[in-house]
C-alpha cells in the first residue's frame, strides 16, 4: 500500500471516529438541545488546542452481538488542551455511542487522562452524559467505575477536578462527580440520582419525576450536590473557563495573578452607612463583597443553596481569594447544618489549593430547634470549625456586626490561627446578644418588677449597659482578639495590605496520616 493510501485510510478512520455513533444519533442529540462530545470540547478549550488521545480504541466485548457493533473511541472523547493558555485534561462521554454507557475500555481511556493529569499537575474536566454502566459487560463495567473513583480520590486536593453534567448521570456513575471539587448541571437536560423514578416507585411507592428527583434545581437548591445550575451547555462551558481562572493548576502552585486596574486604596464611602442602626434589620452582604473586591467581580459558588452564607472567588489587587460571608438578608445570617457544610467544604478547597481566605462576619448564632439538633448541627458546625482551624493559607477576617457565642468561634476567630482580624465599629463580639444576655443575667430581677413601664425601662437600661461594656469591638480588641477596628470605607485597602503581608506565610500542621474531620 502506497503512503498516500495509508494516509487516506488514516483520514477516513479519523472521520469515522468523529462521527461517533453516526449522523442519525448526532441529529437526535441536537434535537434534544444537546451538543456532541466533540462540540462541547471545542467550545471549552482554546481554539485549535485540543490533542485527542485513544481515538481508535474499541471495546472488547463479543456477547449480546456487541462484536458487530464497534465504534472508534468507544463512547468517550479524551485528551488535553488549554484554557487561557493553561493545560487541562478533559474527557467527554459520547451519548451517541451506546448512550454513553461505561465500558471497560472507556474507563481505561478516562483513567489514562486522569493519570497523565496527575503526572503533569493539571486540572481534569469531566463532561458527563451517560446512561450508566454498559450492562453487557457486567462486572468489568463496575470495575471500571471503581478505577475512576480511586483516581478521583487520589487527585483530590492535588489537582482541581470539575464535573459538568450535561445529560443523564445515574446509579454508580454519580460518585465520580461527587468526588470532584465542583459540579455544574444544565437546567434542561441533566439529572443525577442513585435510583431512578421507576425504582423509587417500585420500592417505596413514591411517584416522582426525573427533574423532581435529581434535576439541576433540586441539586443546586435543596441537596447542595451541584455547585452551579446553568441555563444551557454554552453557559456551563464558559463557567468552567471562568472558574479555572481563579484556581491554580495544582496544589504546589498559586492561583494565577492578574493585572489589577482597580485602585488598591479605593475608598467606598457607602460602606460607612451600609449597616442599619437597628441591629435586627437585614442587609445584603453581597453589596459589601462587590464594593471591596477588584472591579466588583465575584464568582459565587452554591448561589442558590444555604443562602444564609455566601462563598465564592474574587480578587484583591489581582490576587485570587476565597470569600466566606454570613448573609443577614437570609435567615438573619444564622448558621444551620447546610450553611456549615457549605462553608466548611469551600474553606477546605481554598486551603488545599493555596487560595487565601477572607471572611466577612455577621452571625447571630446557630439555628436552634429540634430539627437542627436531630439533623446533627453539632457535627456540621464542627466541620466549619475544623476547616478553619486546619487551614494554613493566609486568613483575614472582618467582623461587620454580630459575632455571638459558638458561631463567633467557627467563623475565622483569632484563636483558630487566623492571621489578621479586623472589626468595624458596628461589630458586636460577645457570648450572646445584649437582649438575651440581660434575660439571663437579670431575669429574676425583671420578673419581680410588676409595672410594665418600669420593667421596660429597667430592661432598656441593662441592655444599654451590656452593649456598652461587651457588645462592641473594643472589648475583644482590648485582649488582642481583634487586631484593629477599622473604618468601613477603608476595608478594601486594609484587606489588600494584610494579604500582601501574608504572601510569604509559612505554616504547617503536625505530621499525620490524615485528619479525622467530623463527618
Roles of regions detected by a PLM:
Residues 1-519:
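Ligand-binding clefts of soluble mixed alpha/beta catalytic domains
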Amino acid at each position: 500500500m502506497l503512503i498516500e493510501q495509508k494516509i487516506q485510510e488514516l483520514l477516513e478512520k479519523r472521520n469515522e471516529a468523529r462521527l461517533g455513533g453516526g449522523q442519525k444519533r448526532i441529529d437526535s442529540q441536537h434535537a434534544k438541545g444537546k451538543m456532541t462530545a466533540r462540540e462541547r470540547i471545542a467550545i471549552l478549550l482554546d481554539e485549535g488546542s485540543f490533542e485527542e488521545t485513544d481515538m481508535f480504541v474499541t471495546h472488547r466485548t463479543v456477547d449480546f452481538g456487541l462484536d458487530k457493533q464497534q465504534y472508534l473511541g468507544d463512547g468517550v472523547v479524551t485528551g488535553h488542551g488549554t484554557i487561557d493558555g493553561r493545560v487541562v485534561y478533559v474527557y467527554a462521554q459520547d451519548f451517541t455511542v451506546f448512550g454513553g454507557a461505561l465500558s471497560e475500555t472507556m474507563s481505561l481511556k478516562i483513567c489514562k487522562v486522569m493519570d497523565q493529569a496527575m503526572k503533569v499537575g493539571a486540572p481534569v474536566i469531566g463532561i458527563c452524559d451517560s446512561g450508566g454502566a454498559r450492562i453487557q459487560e457486567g462486572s468489568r463495567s463496575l470495575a471500571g467505575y471503581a478505577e475512576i473513583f480511586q483516581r478521583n480520590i487520589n487527585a483530590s486536593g492535588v489537582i482541581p477536578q470539575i464535573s459538568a453534567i450535561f445529560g443523564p448521570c445515574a446509579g454508580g456513575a454519580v460518585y465520580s462527580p461527587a468526588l470532584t471539587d465542583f459540579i455544574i448541571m444544565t437546567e434542561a437536560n441533566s439529572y443525577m440520582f442513585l435510583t431512578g423514578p421507576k425504582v423509587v416507585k417500585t420500592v417505596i411507592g413514591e411517584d416522582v419525576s426525573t427533574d423532581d428527583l435529581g434535576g439541576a434545581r433540586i441539586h443546586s437548591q435543596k441537596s447542595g450536590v451541584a455547585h452551579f445550575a446553568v441555563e444551557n451547555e454554552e453557559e456551563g462551558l464558559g463557567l468552567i473557563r471562568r472558574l479555572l481562572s481563579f484556581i491554580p493548576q495544582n496544589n504546589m502552585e498559586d492561583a494565577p495573578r492578574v493585572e489589577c486596574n482597580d485602585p488598591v486604596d479605593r475608598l467606598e464611602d457607602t460602606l460607612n452607612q451600609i449597616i442599619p442602626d437597628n441591629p435586627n434589620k437585614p442587609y445584603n452582604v453581597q453589596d459589601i463583597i462587590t464594593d471591596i473586591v477588584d472591579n466588583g467581580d465575584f464568582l459565587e459558588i452554591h448561589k442558590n443553596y444555604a443562602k444564609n452564607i455566601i462563598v465564592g472567588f474574587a480578587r484583591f489587587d489581582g490576587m485570587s481569594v476565597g470569600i466566606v460571608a454570613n448573609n443577614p438578608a437570609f435567615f438573619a445570617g444564622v448558621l444551620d447544618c447546610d450553611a456549615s457544610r457549605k462553608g466548611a467544604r469551600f474553606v477546605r478547597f481554598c486551603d488545599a489549593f493555596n487560595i487565601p481566605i477572607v471572611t466577612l462576619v455577621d452571625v447571630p448564632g446557630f439555628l436552634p430547634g429540634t430539627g437542627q439538633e436531630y439533623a446533627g448541627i453539632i457535627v456540621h458546625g464542627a466541620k466549619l470549625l475544623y476547616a478553619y482551624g486546619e487551614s494554613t493559607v493566609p486568613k483575614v477576617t472582618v467582623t461587620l456586626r454580630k459575632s455571638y457565642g459558638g458561631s463567633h468561634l467557627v467563623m475565622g476567630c483569632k484563636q483558630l490561627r487566623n492571621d489578621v482580624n479586623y472589626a468595624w465599629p458596628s461589630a458586636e463580639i460577645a457570648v450572646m446578644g445584649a437582649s438575651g444576655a440581660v434575660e439571663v443575667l437579670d431575669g429574676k430581677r425583671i420578673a419581680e418588677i410588676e409595672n410594665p413601664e418600669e420593667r421596660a425601662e429597667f430592661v432598656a437600661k441593662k441592655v444599654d449597659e451590656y452593649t456598652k461594656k461587651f457588645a462592641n469591638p473594643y472589648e475583644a480588641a482590648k485582649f488582642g482578639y481583634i487586631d484593629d477596628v477599622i473604618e468601613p470605607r477603608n476595608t478594601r485597602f486594609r484587606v489588600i495590605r494584610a494579604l500582601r503581608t501574608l504572601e510569604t506565610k509559612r505554616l504547617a500542621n503536625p505530621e499525620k496520616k490524615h485528619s479525622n474531620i467530623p463527618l
